[in-house]
Amino acid sequence: MAEMSKTEIARFIRQGTFTGKLATVKKDGGSHVVPIWFVLDNENSKGRSRIGNIVFTTYSVSAKAKNIGRNNRVSICIDDQIPPFSFVTIFGTAEIHTYKQKEVLKWAKRIAKRYMGKDEAEAYGKRNSGEGEVLVKIRPIKIIAEKDIASWD
């Protein structure tokens, strides 16, 4: 088992269709964990080794949106399912953006393209950007990343 470099973290998070397991804080202080589809917003990051913000869409009155509205501290874990196994856990703050539908659609299509492919991106993008959908951006504060957890080396 070894720590990932910043470049390895960025590459790992961008690859394939790994879902993120998002943890938010419930009203009673307990945790709420759900899988999410996401992409990275690299507009304000410098270089390929920087991951930028994590972006996803959700319904404005979903449990995760309500939780973020009360307490914006979140964590997200992205892991693979193939030995020797690796993971990235990001601790950060989330911000809900109530953009116009056109902006939410732009991001929803990017997310859908990653998980459903180019042919389905438009349909899934529209489905996940309708009335009441919002954009959430997570700004990373701390990252823990390990690779080859089950390796004998």
Segments the model singles out, each with a brief description of its role:
Residues 13-14, 69-70, 129:
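Alpha-helix boundary recognition
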Residues 81-83:
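AMP-binding (ANL) adenylation modules
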Residues 58-63, 115:
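Short, solvent-exposed aromatic-acidic interface loops
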Residues 17-60, 68, 74-78, 88-89:
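Short beta-strand segments
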